[in-house]
Amino acid sequence: MGITLTEPELYLGEDVTGIATFHFAQGVACAWTGRAPDKESDNEDALGLIPCGSNAGVLVVADGLGGLPSGKQASSIAVRQVSRNIVASCNEHPVFREAILDGIEQANQRVMATGTGGGTTIAMVEIVNRTIRPYHVGDSEILVTGQRGRIKHQTISHSPVGYAIEAGRLEAGDAIHDEERHLVSNIIGATDMRVEIGPRITLAPLDTLVIGSDGLFDNLHAGEIKEI
């Protein structure tokens, strides 16, 4: 099932019909993006699968903010820019950290230079020989689960709700109903943008990696996501 990617596969503000499936970095990657069922405006999300040989690559999701066209433009800028940097850094022994961080910083400068007031979140995972490392800005999240559904890693959303959960002041199950769940504290497109880098994690054969925007994580509990 699926094809083997040899060059970047990018989805920039478009709705994907069905789930796109690819052989990617010694595993199988499934991609889908679409606007919310009750939303009349265009899809502001973007995603990319950027391979580097058969054993490595980077997965990225960006969620545009600020309303159309600026949100859609911002997420597309971010995914295109990091994709360019990753492709340029790809070699027999890839080291993605510098390319990812430089790509995010360059995307931040380019989004601010548009002058539209738009911004975007971003969540990225580098994969090299079944070892991953997460990077994120904003409230798009990264989740790693084990064979029996145990949560092995979950990023902290850069938002009032995310910080409240981490501090123990809000139960994760109550976050979906919190009135501040749509607020985000850190974005590409701001002078104070910062990138959070997670730990290196070696994936077991049946581990699952999920990268999604708040459209996923604001509507389903982590426990529900891992069941899917």
Region locations from a protein language model:
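PP2C/PPM-type serine/threonine phosphatase catalytic domain
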Residues: 1-228
